[in-house]
A protein has these predicted regions:
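Extracytoplasmic substrate-binding proteins
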Residues: 47, 57, 138-212, 216, ...
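Short helix-initiation/N-cap motifs at beta->coil->alpha
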Residues: 53-55, 107-119, 156, 241-250
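Alpha-helical, coiled-coil/dimerization segments enriched in small aliphatic residues
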Residues: 94-96, 107, 217-245
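Proline-aspartate-enriched helix->loop->beta-strand connector
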Residues: 117-131, 148, 249-266
Length: 332
């Protein structure tokens, strides 16, 4: 082999050696770029935005895993949409059977929010705080000033609004499909009730009122009125057509003279025992001439159904219908 050929062989050997040494690094770099690209693509697909009822847009790169709920209705909706380990804290009312339908399920999440102090919420290290709009504006502002990711929603006043809230919270938690499943179940139950009531003529439909011993309350838009509409009865208080929400006098209650009186069973202060409330109404001299009192149609009804605005509003429709038309549904 001459000198020229020998040099050529050495050169080729060096090139081959360099390829062997640097090819893994080259491939590794290429794979790293591919992995990074795939990761970025996955993040783009998993990220989403939602806008709350104040117009504030929230950005998420992944589903929230430390959610804090500030109302019983949100508690109930969340428990139907996400696993318990994704909820950091629920509202204190979730443990009250007078207004909560998930007392047992809620035991899986021990933490509770108390009062309106946002500083206390920080201890839960939340990545999402859901607050209904009936809380004080200064509380909502404080939450945002503390850097918390806060979603504020409008409290629903009818079944349509409840479905909207479920869709909002489902989108917020990255669980849209589960949200639609919850709504579908609600709608199916309400439809079944209405089908059973279809043959009751308008002239035989019952007029009802929700009453406590202190009296009744009028609100032009209220969830109980919508429950009544779907349950084949009418909320007699809505006949008053007052310009705004207000208390109803005993005289007006007597004038309305409903077929049925429903007493919400919620002893919220230890002074409103459901049976005691019912007896007070039955024994009130002002009410003795009312047909509901005379016929003994003063019924206690679960506050957990008629006082909250979650998917359990479908249960409220069913319960009101059953209690109003036992001849259709059979006596409990």
């Amino acid at each position: 082999m001459n000198k020229s050929e020998n040099n050529k062989t050495v050169f080729l050997y060096v090139i081959l050696l360099l390829l062997v040494l640097f090819m893994p690094a080259f491939l590794g770099c290429k794979n790293e770029k591919a992995d990074t690209s795939s990761k970025n693509e996955a993040e783009r697909h998993s990220s989403y935005t939602v806008t709350d009822d104040t117009g504030l847009t929230l950005q998420f790169t992944e589903k929230p895993k430390r959610i804090v709920s500030y109302s019983i209705s949100t508690d109930e909706i969340l428990m139907a949409l996400v696993k318990p380990e994704r909820i950091a804290a629920l509202s204190r009312l979730v443990d009250d059977p007078g207004v909560s339908s998930i007392v047992e399920e809620a035991k899986q999440i021990p933490a509770r929010v108390q009062g309106n102090s946002m500083e206390n919420v920080l201890t839960f290290k939340p990545d999402l705080v859901i607050i209904p709009d009936f809380h004080p504006p200064e509380m909502l502002q404080s939450a945002r000033e503390l850097g918390l990711k806060v979603y504020i929603y409008k409290t629903p006043s009818d079944i349509k609004g409840v479905k909207r809230s479920i869709r909002q919270i489902a989108a917020l938690t990255g669980e849209k499909e589960k949200g639609e499943a919850v709504i579908a179940k609600m709608e199916a139950r309400i439809q079944q009730v209405q089908q059973r009531l279809a043959n009751i003529p308008a002239s035989q439909r019952k007029r009802v009122i929700q009453l406590r011993s202190e009296g009744a309350f009028y609100a032009p838009d209220n969830s109980f009125g919508d429950v009544c509409r779907h349950a084949g009865v009418s909320d007699a208080t809505l006949e008053l057509k007052y310009p705004s929400a207000m208390e109803i006098t005993q005289e007006k209650v007597v004038e309305l003279n409903p077929d049925i009186i429903f007493v919400p069973a919620w002893d919220y202060d230890g002074k409103h025992n459901p049976d005691g409330e019912r007896r007070k109404i039955l024994n009130n001299p002002s009410y003795r001439g009312m047909k509901a009192v005379q016929q003994g149609k003063v019924y206690t009804i679960s506050g957990a159904l008629v006082l909250t605005v979650s998917q359990y509003i479908a249960d409220a429709v069913e319960e009101v219908a059953k209690m109003s038309y036992p001849e259709v549904f059979g006596k409990n």
